[in-house]
Amino acid sequence: MNPNQKIITIGSVSLGLVVLNILLHIVSITITVLVLPGNGNSGNCNETIIREYNETVRIEKVTQRHNTNVIEYIERPESDHFMNNTEPLCDAKGFAPFSKDNGIRIGSRGHIFVIREPFVSCSPTECRTFFLTQGSLLNDKHSNGTVKDRSPYRTLMSVEIGQSPNVYQARFEAVAWSATACHDGKKWMTIGVTGPDAKAVAVVHYGGIPTDVINSWAGNILRTQESSCTCIQGECYWVMTDGPANRQAQYRVFKAKQGKIIGQTEISFNGGHIEECSCYPNEGKVECVCRDNWTGTNRPVLVISSDLSYRVGYLCAGLPSDTPRGEDSQFTGSCTSPMGNQGYGVKGFGFRQGNDVWMGRTISRTSRSGFEILKIRNGWTQNSKEQIKKQVVVDNLNWSGYSGSFTLPVELTKRNCLVPCFWVEMIRGKPEEKTIWTSSSSIVMCGVEHEIADWSWHDGAILPFDIDKM
C-alpha cells in the first residue's frame, strides 16, 4: 500500500468512527427525551441534600435535568413560635464545663480577634459566644493600646459556642463598645452602644437589621449589660445605665418585641448604683444581679415583671461577691443598702435557688484573679453566711475578670426547667502583664445534678507574644 492509500484508509476509518459516535449520541438523546417521559417520568430527579460547610449547615436543593445539576441555596428555616422561658431554674448541685475557647493561646499564631467582654446567649437551636472586638488581631501592630474601653473600631461579633473568636467563623452583629444580645425563639436581637461619650447611641438589631435606637438621656457614657438580655414569651428585656461610674447615675429597663421598643421604665435607686447586670428568666420574671461601682461590695439585685414593675435592692447574703472587697468575717450583708464601702468593682452574677443563692466571685479580694462559685443557704432572702457548697473554676494563681449568667432553654435540653449557666472571662495583657495589648478568653459552665471537683480551667497563654518584643 502506497502512502496515499494509507492516508485515505486512515481518514476513512476516522470519519466512520466520528459518524458512529454522533449516531450513538442521537440515539441516547432520543431515548432520554422521548422514551423516558412516555413512561410517566418527568425527566427531572429532584432531591434535597443537606451538606455541612465550614461548620455551618447549608441546605441545597439539587435538580438534575438531562445530566445537568441545578443547585439552589435555601436559607435555614426560622422557628414560627417564640420561646416561653417561664419555667423555673433547674436545681444545680454543681457546674460542669460546657466550653472553653482558648482564643489567646491560639492567637499567638492564628488569626484571632483582640476582644473583651465575651458572653454567651442561646437560641432554641444553638448557643453563641458574643464578644466586643477591638478591630484588630492578636500579635499584630493594631493591638497596641487595646486596653482602652471605647473606640470607633469596636464591634460586637459572635461565633458558635466553643469556637475561638477567629476571623473565619465570626459573624458581625453590631458596631459597639457596649452590648447585649438574646434570642426570642424566632430571631436574634442585639443592642450595640457606640458613639461619643456625651451622645452615645444604642442601636437595636433584629434578625441582623437595625430596627430601633436609644439615644443617651444623661449624656454620660450610655452603657448596657455586657451579657445576655432576657426574652420571655416574645418580649425581651435589658437594663441600661447612663451617668457617673462612681456616684449616683440613672438606670432604665427596656422591653422590645421583634426589635421594636414597646416599653421602658426608670429605676429609682437613690444611694445605690447599678451597672452591667447579669440577668436570666425565672418563673416568668427577669432576675438580675448587677455591679455597684460606687460603694457596695454586695451586688444590686433587680427583679423585673412583664409589666415593667420591679423590685430593687441588694443581694442579702452575708458574704460579699464584688472585687475589691473586705474580709468575709467583717461583712454583715444587707438586702436594701450598699455595704463594704469599696469603690470600683467587676461584673458578676448570681442565681436564685428558692431562698438560696449561687454567687460567683474572684478568689482574690483585691484583684481580678481566681474564680469560685458559692451556694449560700437562704442567701437570697437573709444575711446568711452559711456556705452549702463551693466550687473553684480558676485558681488564684491565674487571672480572671468579668463573669455573667445565661440559661439553656427547654428547647435545647428537653427538660421542664431552665438550666443555669455562667461564663468567666480570663483577661490577659495590660494592665497586669507586660504586653502592648489587652484581650481575654473564657470558660463556660452549666448546672448539673452532681457535684463537680475543683480545678483550674485558666487561660494558659504564654506571654509576651512576638509583637510585644519589638
From Swiss-Prot:
Cellular compartment(s): Virion membrane; Host apical cell membrane
Single GO MF annotation: exo-alpha-sialidase activity
Principal EC category: hydrolase
Major location category of this protein: virion
Annotated catalysed reactions: Hydrolysis of alpha-(2->3)-, alpha-(2->6)-, alpha-(2->8)- glycosidic linkages of terminal sialic acid residues in oligosaccharides, glycoproteins, glycolipids, colominic acid and synthetic substrates
Glycosylation sites noted in the Swiss-Prot or TrEMBL record: N46, N54, N84, N144, N293, N398
Residues annotated as catalytic: D149 (proton donor/acceptor), Y402 (nucleophile)
EC number: 3.2.1.18
Function: Catalyzes the removal of terminal sialic acid residues from viral and cellular glycoconjugates. Cleaves off the terminal sialic acids on the glycosylated HA during virus budding to facilitate virus release. Additionally helps virus spread through the circulation by further removing sialic acids from the cell surface. These cleavages prevent self-aggregation and ensure the efficient spread of the progeny virus from cell to cell. Otherwise, infection would be limited to one round of replication.
Name of protein: Neuraminidase
Organism of provenance: Influenza A virus (strain A/Turkey/Minnesota/501/1978 H6N8)
